[in-house]
Amino acid sequence: MFSMRLCEATCLLALLAGSTMAAETRVYRTEAHGEMREVESNFWSELPQGRANTVDLDAAFSGHPFTGLGVSIPESSCYLLSRLPAERRADILRTIWTTAGAGLSVARLQIGSSDYSMHAYTYDDAAGDRELAHFSIDEDRRHILPVVKEIQNVNPEVTFFASPWSPPAWMKEGGNIAGGRLLKENYDVYARYLVKYIQALQNEGVTISAVTAQNEPESDQSGMSPTCLWSGEEEATFIVDYLAPALKEAGLATRPWLWDHNFDGTNRVWRSLAQKGVLESIGAVAWHPYAGEPEWIRPIHAKYPTLPMVMTEMGPHIDRYRRDMLWWGDLMMRTFNSGCGGFTSWCMVLDERGQPNISGGFPCAGFVELNSVTGEAVPSEQFKAFRHFGRFVRRGADILTGFWKTGDSDWARQNDRRTVCAAFRNPDGSQVVVIGCTPTKGAPFSPVQVQVKFKSRYLIVQALA
């Protein structure tokens, strides 16, 4: 199977090659702001067609496993969806969570309130309640859990992980949910707090496969939302000495994930991984791309090739909501090629102003925009990029490496263009290749061609760029 996606002024190609060549080759195209549709494919040839850049699937080898594409499910998104008629809500969820739409299979939950909640809360705001006698997830039952259960009905294969924005205020320096640090004398009670959350969700039929110690541990969001600051040493100590043992003692398979912040934090991650017990205690390193570049994590992946890495948050900015899908495809491909096995967006649904959020001032847009006036659900450009992966790449696929061969010709060099590529091998043996091409600003439109080699045959894929 072969799928190709085209868009105005840029080109994003997603290729699936099955095991019997032409009979299983299909081409799909998405034009700018349009729908994906199947188009006629070219023929495979036994001879190379010129000295082109080549995606050589015959030479590719396994890199690391693909764990899925996802989106976060904050209270704000669930509140907006709760106001819709049931069937309308189900239509939107099917668009996001099935392969007829974006094909997402991973959901990120917030432990307590986040910047995209209706108000600030935790699950135990009773000051000094070290026994957690007042612990309750009733706030999540208002909007979040009903939507989570509808997502499970739409796609029972969805997996969940969770991140906290802040411990209860009474556990922290300064007694404020916004900013500050967790008091060391409360590491134990906070680990038990996180365990109680995971158990409470389990009782609701929601299995939390992983938990990060803290969302963005080096950001206090200028006091605008729940946050908590952690040094690398504090985070590592909490995971190794408190959180991982508490999860094990409770009989939970949930794994702690390290960091959950930007690519520019590689030095901190290096130091944390060198701390005694960290590698044995964590299930992955989690990343955000708001600062730094995906390539910065490659040395960590090379040093620890069996340590999973995942992208846990990145969504559209409200001022750049219509940023083209190639920008997102480029980021995703570079992230996969740098060692991450999964990519999760930020808010599932927001309105056209990026609302609601806890302060009213945060600038994020939704994976899907729900217009507050018309009620229309508009997929973002990020959604359209996700769709080219989510429809075709299956959980457990190998993310391949060693497949790109630069051709020796002016045509291949394409000095005015930039090409990025990612390749996958699904559990059923089908091959998926995503190729992104874009011209330098001001360059004339002309064909962009890349040669795909599979089972000693060749296929030229072409699009206008």
Please tell me what each predicted stretch does.
Residues 406-462:
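Carbohydrate-binding surface patches
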Residues 188-210, 217-319:
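Active-site neighborhood of glycoside hydrolase catalytic domains
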Residues 3-12:
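Sec-dependent signal peptide recognition
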